[in-house]
């Protein structure tokens, strides 16, 4: 039989599908710059639990925000991973709305690649970046990250990015979704 997870997606079709799913609760900002592998930034803002992504899980309460970046890289090396992790982190930090009432901000680079080097995968899974503001009175920032390797269908994440990884798996690979190509 054919490997079901095998290349059913190009990076472009995978990203298009993710953007379609994210657009229900994120504001999507397509990237302007063609030289840059970031294809879109998806912004999520929430005040005291107005958005519930699934009826079962209310993920965040109070003032929370997430900046999720979809990054299209054919072959992810450790060097590329570190370069774009740092770029996204710096870009995201500039966007945070920090102050009283702010609870948490997530900066979430999601790497969409055909293939990925093991050292890049390891670095991504170990990545931990967080910061608290004003001794946590003004909340905190956590760096979540996930990776989809389309040639194998493997999805990895750092500890903070697990819910992102679950969402990616559901959107890209759950059998229910196969019908609506």
Language-model regions: role of each:
Residues 56, 95-99, 131-135:
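Catalytic micro-motifs at enzyme active sites that drive phosphoryl/nucleotidyl and oxygen chemistry
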Residues 64-95:
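A broadly used, surface-exposed interaction patch
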Residues 82-87, 121-128:
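"Short basic amphipathic alpha-helical interaction patches in structured regions
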Residues 99-125, 149:
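Nucleic-acid nuclease catalytic cores
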